[in-house]
């Protein structure tokens, strides 16, 4: 893990923060300073790529990494800012000619499902999209919704994230 300390999700921050914030919401005591440091690390990770996001480019892991990062920030109570707005713009530009979001590689169990990629991107748009992006967000959500309704899941991950995504778009 020490060798990967600059990497975001699977090496250090995303899923552990989800576990910490879930534990806190259920009454467990957690180290709040540590949680804030991890949230700041995540925000800084995204911030280093802000200009790339505005141009429709991202970082390694593309939609999955950016989507999990925004999900992480939301779980920690992070408020929308210039960086999260840039990531929302990225979701509007990236794969815009596709009817859904696709992972950039096949690395199960964390990066394989088109349903997961679509969910994390839609979630990021819904939580961190700006009012001036609303029309484009609504159009993209409808585009992905149509894909979700007609596409059959192949495995458990697909089923789970298809259901989660359908909740977002209905």
Predicted regions and their residues:
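Preference for long, amphipathic alpha-helical scaffolds in soluble/luminal domains
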Residues: 1-170
